[in-house]
Amino acid sequence: MKKDSESNSSDKSNKEELSTGRRGGNPMIIALVITVLAAMLFFNQPEPSSLISASFFRSQLEKNNIESVEIGDIEVSGTFKTRPQMPASESADGDAKPKELLKRFRFTRPAGADYAVQLSEDLEKRNIKDWKFSPPDNTAAILNLLILVGLPLAIFFFIFMMIRRTRNDMMGGGFLSGFSKSPAKRFEATDKVITFNDVAGLEGVKADLQEIVDFLKTPEKFQKLGGQVPKGVLLNGPPGTGKTLLARAVAGEADVPFFSVNGSEFIQMFVGVGASRVRDLFKTAKEQSPSIIFIDEIDAVGRQRGAGLGGGHDEREQTLNQILGEMDGFGGAQAVIVIAATNRPDVLDPALLRPGRFDRHVTVGRPTMKGREEIFKVHVRDVPLGDDVDLHRLAAGTVGLTGADIRNMVNEAALWAARGDKKIVEMSDFDYARDKILMGAKREEVLLESEKEKTAYHEAGHTLTAWHLEGSHIVHKVTIIPRGRALGVTQYVPNEDRLSMSKRELEHQLIVLLGGRAAEKIIYTETCVGAENDLERATSIARRMVTHWGMSPKIGPVSYKTSDEDPFLGREIHQQRQFSEHTQELIDEEVARILMEADQKAEQLLREHRGQLETITRELLDREELNEAELTELIGPSIHKRLGDEEGKVEQIMAPEGAAERTSNASARRED
């Protein structure tokens, strides 16, 4: 069987090569023809000659300086015995200076029918034997005929061939046929098989997909009872949570052909190519059913129709219409399941989400602590670990990270250990990798003493407010070493896997965010641009409290959608604002009030603990980095220690670094 398949593939490749040769021609033959034509044109160039007058020719003839003559209908040409000097008065081209002529000459034959006869007699008298009459030259007439007749025929033939080739392309052949072919990649049985055992931390999602696997294995079990399997499964969730891996695991468990394609690959520069590719993909999948079609990033082609600025007839919408038609056209006996993945289900067209197309929606969220520990176990299978590596502790300190983040963290730890010529990966390597991913790599640069001191006070303000506020996040580490684009970082350990927060906790979060700015005001009586990122995040939280979560007594329990939430410009243009200008003013006033109150409380708390603020700042300037244990030695146990609330996840707040300060991914995910 293997030999047969190899021979078949060889025959197929040979046919493809032959067909390619027929379409495009053999490059060697084309190059040879071009070379021969170029050589013919080069070697057929006439020998250069000097243009003279008939009188000068007559004078040279009398001086017996003519070696050969060729008499034509239009011109007389020949060669001199010696190269003469032609006076300016005799120059046929109007040259004002005497010049030495070339060996060969030519001049226009004078009018008169008997000139040729008379010239031939003169040549015979002077005993010049090398002369002749040249035959008529019809080259010019032939060229004119080719230009007048041949060129229009060539253009007509070219247009005819293009029309014929375009028709072949529409039927699936020709040199453009590759554009209409589906770009989907098929994963064969020889590829690495992914099963549910390779997917960790998503037990609930795997249970939802197990029914799909059962249908692909034994479809008659469901069809016998009149049941129909979902035609489509939509996996939605943040990037890196394992949506593609889950789709491949479904195919691996069911042992069926798996076609994978990205949504953006359907769209090309030619109109209709996307729809043609969709038809080809579904046709191939139906021929090999039962099978799975996986469309990654389906929001690239499945966005809501009519929401953009391009109208309703662009290439993307034609492709979407074809997908909708193909998913409706499945017969009951065709075991073809479409699995799609997106992290923006809110922008998809409603027709794509209705029952009968994507019947089942599966949310693939970030893993819990138990799930993260299982993911760590999967990714450290081939990594030699030290005895001090505690996967449970790593899982507890990486809340909010996805499977892709954890994989990256394990890889960074292995690279760091290899850089130190270690034989195993130790816990310190994982701590380094976690800090690098969450806070950024350390920057080797020397700060001015004034900047370093201001950064220390800023970070101390964040640390101290979180240290004394109940319900805030546990301080894990604070540093004034520049990392990434930040001059300093305060790293927190919030409560584990929390999905909701109270108004009081949000207010405390605002106080902590504004703590760095408040510390600068207390010490320097002014603030710097380093608090830009803190203000952005605090403003976002306060605005959500007012417009989304009904936490403003003045606005009340109402949800207002603001324009910055629209995923793209077209959708915002087509929608109208749901509230008046007066309501917008009230929203702005309430947001400002909440932030002002948080700022005042942060400043009041820091003034009450001014001594601890100075202590933390002094130690930061001395050590540059303090962890939770060292902070406890300096200022006593935090409120979290006293209340026994010590479980959590890692988050960060960036310190001043100017307008370019950034927010870490982990922090931004939690704040949103």
UniProtKB/Swiss-Prot annotation:
Question: Which residues does the annotation say bind ATP?
Answer: 237-244
The ranges of region (Disordered) come to 1-22, 642-672
Q: Which InterPro entries match?
A: AAA+_ATPase, AAA_lid_3, ATPase_AAA_core, ATPase_AAA_CS, FtsH, P-loop_NTPase, Pept_M41_FtsH_extracell, Peptidase_M41
Q: Name one Pfam family in it.
A: Peptidase_M41
Output compositional bias ranges, type Polar residues: 662-672
According to the UniProt topology, which residue ranges lie Periplasmic? Answer: 45-141
**Which SUPFAM superfamilies does its entry note?**
FtsH protease domain-like, P-loop containing nucleoside triphosphate hydrolases
Q: Which residues bind Zn(2+)?
A: 458, 462, 534
Q: Name one GO molecular function term.
A: ATP-dependent peptidase activity
Binding note for cofactor: Binds 1 zinc ion per subunit.
Q: Which UniProt keywords apply?
A: ATP-binding, Cell inner membrane, Cell membrane, Hydrolase, Membrane, Metal-binding, Metalloprotease, Nucleotide-binding, Protease, Transmembrane, Transmembrane helix, Zinc
- Subcellular location per the Swiss-Prot or TrEMBL entry: Cell inner membrane
Q: Which residues lie on this side of the membrane: Cytoplasmic?
A: 1-23, 163-672
Any single Gene Ontology cellular-component annotation: plasma membrane
Its membrane topology: Multi-pass membrane protein
> Which cofactors are reported in the record for this sequence?
Zn(2+)
State which residue ranges cross the membrane.
24-44, 142-162
- Stated role: Acts as a processive, ATP-dependent zinc metallopeptidase for both cytoplasmic and membrane proteins. Plays a role in the quality control of integral membrane proteins.
UniProt xrefs under HAMAP family: FtsH (MF_01458)
**UniProt protein name:** ATP-dependent zinc metalloprotease FtsH 1
Its source organism is: Rhodopirellula baltica (strain DSM 10527 / NCIMB 13988 / SH1)
